[in-house]
A protein has these predicted regions:
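Mobile active-site "lid"/loop adjacent to the S-adenosyl-L-methionine
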Residues: 274-305
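Conserved Class I SAM-dependent methyltransferase catalytic core
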Residues: 168, 300-363
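Conserved AdoMet
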Residues: 33-83, 87, 112-189
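Non-catalytic nucleic-acid substrate-recognition regions in nucleic-acid-modifying enzymes
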Residues: 1-22, 26, 52-107
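Residue-level signal for inorganic ion chemistry
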Residues: 30, 111, 150, 180, ...
Length: 367
């Protein structure tokens, strides 16, 4: 049977026998490009039957990889300083691609934009210009770190955009994802529809503070508490609070509800660690190598924090208050059942742009 998973595993074994570095990542990248499926979603489509044409293109690409040296020397990124900006960008993209970096062109442009202090969309206006040695060396170092070490560009530049705002990030916190904007959107929608005067919100596992700070700025009459067990995360969330002038949010250390005294929140919101320990095979290398494990992985097949927050959370919500979770791939239905068993009403699943259940909401309603 020519299903995706069988062909993928055979391809990985083939490259490993040929001593290709990072065989799994290389293979997944090839499949992603040829099949038009995001690399992280390949395993979700493991039963997909591949056409003879797809298999032929995959074989051709794998053979090409084994017959050429895909490594590019660091010196080859920029040879000399006389080349113009367009040439340097092209070489950087080539280097990142040959080191199996997804979205190589976008990442290269982000790095150039940051170093040159110019909007990424305006880089083309400088294509014919030459860079000085200082900027060239800085860009080279950034490109090498992403290509060689698989170091996330967000950590490299200490910046990630979320909900239209730039947040400071480093390796002490998870990089805010676009998926989490679905959670924030649903929270804003719920709060505005309720028209609660000065809503009280608890953000558990705040990390960089992206969720809580965004809600604080979008709902300016709210009062928000953001908690985390990590001292590093709390330092970063405080930094973002200051950078973005979010005055109506406070951060403090707490293991879930351990240090929380207030028990009439209008909303509890959380994007907790939800990855099971056996799911590392579908995760990107940069995430595994550099993002904090404590922000990624959870016991009980990734469901531990959903159970704990759901169970304990009822004591901290006012009657009529809401609880909102972001969930991992294929977790939404299970989390919905956990919340229903725990006694929440009006439990709903909200899907993201890819039609995947991303957010689960419920309400505390007691007679």
């Amino acid at each position: 049977m020519n299903n995706l998973l069988d062909i993928l595993n055979k391809s990985i074994n083939y490259l490993e026998k040929k001593n290709i570095k990072n065989a799994r990542i290389v293979t997944e990248t090839v499949f992603s490009q040829i099949l038009g499926i995001e690399r992280i979603m390949l395993y979700a489509n493991f039963e997909k039957v591949l056409s003879d044409g797809d298999i032929a293109r995959i074989k051709e690409k794998l053979n090409e990889i084994t017959t050429q040296n895909n490594e590019i020397s660091d010196k080859e990124i920029f040879e000399g300083n006389s080349e113009n900006l367009k040439s340097l960008i092209d070489k950087s993209v080539s280097y990142l691609e040959k080191n199996n970096i997804n979205e190589a062109k976008l990442i290269a442009e982000i790095i150039f934009s940051h170093v040159l202090e110019i909007d990424r969309m305006l880089l083309f206006t400088k294509y014919k210009e030459n860079l000085d040695k200082e900027k060239t060396d800085k860009i080279r170092n950034f490109i090498q770190k992403v290509g060689k070490e698989k170091f996330p560009v967000q950590y490299l530049l200490n910046e990630q955009e979320f909900y239209g705002r730039k947040f400071y990030v480093n390796t002490g916190v998870l990089i805010p994802r676009q998926d989490t904007e679905v959670l924030v959107e649903e929270a804003i929608k719920t709060l505005r529809s309720e028209k609660t005067e000065t809503p009280k919100i608890l953000d558990i596992g705040t990390g960089s503070g992206a969720i809580g700070i965004t809600l604080a700025l979008e709902i300016p009459d709210s009062k928000i508490m953001g908690t985390d067990i990590s001292d590093k995360a709390l330092e970063i969330s405080e930094k973002n609070k200051s950078l973005l002038n979010a005055e109506n949010i406070k951060f403090f250390k707490s293991d879930l509800f351990e240090n929380i005294e207030y028990k009439k929140f209008d909303m509890i919101i959380s994007n907790p660690p939800y990855i099971a320990s056996d799911e590392t095979k579908v995760m990107s290398e940069d995430t595994l190598l550099h993002e904090p494990d404590e922000a990624l992985f959870a016991e009980d097949e990734g469901l531990y924090f959903y159970r704990e927050i759901s169970f304990q959370g009822k004591e901290y919500l006012r009657n009529g208050g809401y609880i909102l979770f972001e969930t991992g791939y294929k977790q939404a239905e299970t989390v919905k059942k956990i919340m229903e068993i725990t006694g929440y009403k009006n439990v709903n699943i909200i899907k993201d742009m890819q039609n995947i259940g991303r957010v689960v909401t419920g309400q505390k309603l007691e007679s």
